[in-house]
Amino acid sequence: MDEFFLMNSFDLAGKTVYLRVDINAPVNPLTGEIMGIDRFRAHIDTIRNLRNSKVVIVAHQSRPGKDDFISLRQHAQILSHLLNKRVQFVDQLFGSQVNRAVSEMSDGDIVMLENSRFYSEEVDLTTIESMESSNIVRSLSPLFDYFIIDAFAAIHRAQTTLVGFHRIKPNIAGTLIEREVSMIERFRKIREKPKIAILGGAKIEDSIAVSENFLSRGFVDKILTGGVVANAFLWASGFDIGKKNREFIMKNNGDYEKLLDKCRAILSKYGDKLVMPTDFVMNPSGQRISINEKIPDDQILADIGLDTIVEYSEIIDGARAIFMNGPMGMYEIEDYSSGTREVFTAVAHSKAFKLAGGGHTLSALDKLGLTKMIDHASTGGGALISYLSGETMPVLEALKESKKLFEG
């Protein structure tokens, strides 16, 4: 972690600090209420460590055009409840109201600004130079002594409030980013074998990218698949997965033929290292079926079957390091939760180093009471996948450059 400024690199007491977090959360489409607060909890240590500073919080919620693209007023209330402390909400990201609120702050005060993605400069600008010339950066820069970036779940985004200040004043990695990077690097450096990945859920494109990257670099020895991800690989390998399962993949993936071609390429190169289910539980019938049998057109492959659970559990038991992202099936429905429950329980009881990521994965672990048995449950979804896949992380690069510019 020598590459970044950390929060103990400076005396922040009495200083005015900008704190960029990621508290992007699911929203109930009927009531407009925030439904999950895991990401809020993840930032509490960082905020409490700034108890003697004036803290101004910047964050985003969703993106333009989405139903959950809402104000952060509710987010401020949730943080206030978690901290047992007033969090003042200002319905601007920059401007006279923000200037006034910051000028009136005392040490220990917390202010939260409006959704950064309400402003086109947050999402439209693509170069650091254009960001530095933006109203966001020119208006906010003079207000702060230090900029703390703690939005791990957004480290793969090059957006103005994340990277636009790093050449202007010192940018510091927050407590959450420090912990996330430390634990993920620990996982990456494990050399003991076998090292496995468990990829499930419905995000086929992400899982294909991870599979290709992990296997081509020899990063893992085996990948166990479940959910829609497994269905895609099975379809690509020539199995008839049934009409409803084909339609789901076709409907939810634009150029699905291209995805299937990528699956075929991975299977051609690394077929012996990619493990697919051999049996399933169907919805709505609830019956078990082998992948070699004819799958009725009206049935969904809703969970992995007993034979697959046994096979996967044996592989997990012998592993030295495990990365898990995505459930094995429709775990939210009790009748189709066995695969996820048994596989995740096997991981939790494994002696391996265990890294988990993705919203549905963390939700399932929490529901099963297994979170504390996982070495690291990451707040990153797409960010974690991108990081583990070896992609450049704009936020981490900006933090590194900021240290080079301002140290000594």
From Swiss-Prot:
GO biological process terms on file: gluconeogenesis; glycolytic process
GO molecular function: ADP binding; ATP binding; phosphoglycerate kinase activity
Keyword Oxidoreductase carried by entry: no
The EC number(s) this enzyme carries: 2.7.2.3
Pathway it works in: Carbohydrate degradation; glycolysis; pyruvate from D-glyceraldehyde 3-phosphate: step 2/5
Organism domain of life: Archaea
Gene3D superfamilies on file: Phosphoglycerate kinase, N-terminal domain (3.40.50.1260)
Enzyme class name: transferase
Compartments, as annotated in UniProt: Cytoplasm
Catalytic reaction(s) noted: (2R)-3-phosphoglycerate + ATP = (2R)-3-phospho-glyceroyl phosphate + ADP
Alphabetized Pfam families for the sequence: PGK
Record keywords, A-Z: ATP-binding, Cytoplasm, Glycolysis, Kinase, Nucleotide-binding, Transferase
A GO CC annotation given for this chain: cytosol
Positions contributing to ATP binding: E332, G358, G359, H360, T361
Binding site for substrate: D22, I23, N24, R39, H60, Q61, S62, R63, R117, R157
Quaternary assembly: Monomer.
Homology family: Belongs to the phosphoglycerate kinase family.
Listed name of the protein: Phosphoglycerate kinase
Species of provenance: Thermoplasma acidophilum (strain ATCC 25905 / DSM 1728 / JCM 9062 / NBRC 15155 / AMRC-C165)
